[in-house]
């Protein structure tokens, strides 16, 4: 415990909040190019093959981002838009790819929560 005098000489420093999405640089979305598209397994107790992509952003960052929805058309050199938002059971995945923008197609036959998956309204 510091004395009053020590606190006068050197006041307490506030704890700086750590940025959860550093690659975004305070932007809502960022554009990037897929360098690798692959599947990975979630941590315990979940089990699946989650689709993820390694993306090189326009600002030079290289990040791992999640591809939401069922089925996708992404491959190497696809141009994608990413947003912040982690995937709780995939360590190191802090970004999501936005479906229905640039080279990413929307989810086929999606009827509910369509806007989140870039799906057009069914006829």
Curated annotation (Swiss-Prot):
Q: Does the keyword Signal apply?
A: no
Q: Which residues carry this modification: 3-methylthioaspartic acid?
A: 89
Give a yes or no for keyword rRNA-binding in this entry: yes
- A Pfam family cross-referenced in the UniProt record is Ribosom_S12_S23
User: What molecular functions are annotated in GO for this chain?
Assistant: rRNA binding; structural constituent of ribosome; tRNA binding
Q: Which cysteines are joined by disulfide bonds?
A: none
Q: What does this protein do?
A: With S4 and S5 plays an important role in translational accuracy.
Please state which protein family the record places this protein in: Belongs to the universal ribosomal protein uS12 family.
Q: What is this protein called?
A: Small ribosomal subunit protein uS12
Q: What species is given as this protein's source?
A: Paramagnetospirillum magneticum (strain ATCC 700264 / AMB-1) (Magnetospirillum magneticum)
């Amino acid at each position: 415990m510091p004395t009053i005098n020590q606190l006068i000489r050197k006041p307490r420093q506030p704890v700086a909040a750590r940025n959860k999405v550093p690659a975004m640089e305070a932007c809502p979305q960022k554009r990037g190019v897929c360098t690798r598209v692959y599947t990975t397994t979630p941590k315990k107790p979940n089990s699946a093959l989650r689709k993820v992509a390694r993306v090189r952003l326009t600002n030079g960052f290289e990040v791992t981002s999640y591809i939401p929805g069922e089925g996708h058309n992404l491959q190497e050199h696809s141009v994608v838009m990413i947003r912040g938002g982690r995937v709780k059971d995939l360590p190191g995945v802090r970004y999501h790819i936005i479906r229905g923008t640039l080279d990413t197609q929307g989810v086929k036959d999606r009827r509910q929560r369509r806007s989140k998956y870039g799906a057009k309204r069914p006829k």
